[in-house]
């Protein structure tokens, strides 16, 4: 689903994700500006840094910044496993809980129910809890219902 009018009015910065299977990042806030990156990864988390009419200045997980039409963005919260080693996905939001699987760096999942230092994450058909420190796409200590 594309971002709703309420999402367009959110104070910046805020988190979003790529809604479309193909989304062009541009050097400026208009289709006349050159495209710098064509994203082909639905649900990729992005940080919205600035608004200009129907365009948003975004930052991707690699730190690339550019402009994207708001219609190509979604309010759906997603996160990417940070670089480094595979991260443990736990049965419950507790370091001592059973590890249900391990997620490789760069894997993207949908997040919800974040509080304290943990988020519930769904990667494909698998789900569990991941430490916020292990993902990109959520602010430290952020609460997501």
Q: Which sequence ranges carry the predicted segments?
A:
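Second-shell loop/turn segments in exported
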Residues: 30-33
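N-terminal signal peptide c-region/cleavage motif recognized by signal peptidases
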Residues: 2-4
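SH3-family beta-barrel domains
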Residues: 7-27, 38-42, 49-93, 98-126, ...
């Amino acid at each position: 689903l594309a971002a709703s009018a309420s999402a367009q009015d959110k104070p910046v910065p805020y988190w979003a994700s790529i809604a479309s299977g193909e989304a062009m990042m541009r050097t400026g806030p208009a289709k006349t500006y050159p495209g710098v990156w064509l994203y082909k990864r639905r649900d990729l988390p992005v940080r919205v840094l600035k608004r200009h009419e129907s365009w948003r200045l975004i930052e991707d997980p690699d730190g690339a910044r550019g402009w994207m039409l708001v219609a190509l963005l979604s309010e759906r919260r997603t996160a990417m496993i940070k670089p480094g080693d595979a991260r443990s996905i736990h049965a419950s939001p507790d370091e001592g809980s059973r590890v249900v699987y391990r997620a490789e760096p760069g894997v993207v999942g949908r997040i919800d129910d974040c509080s304290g230092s943990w988020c519930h994450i769904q990667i494909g058909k698998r789900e569990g809890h991941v430490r916020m420190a292990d993902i990109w796409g959520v602010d430290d200590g952020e609460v997501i219902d």
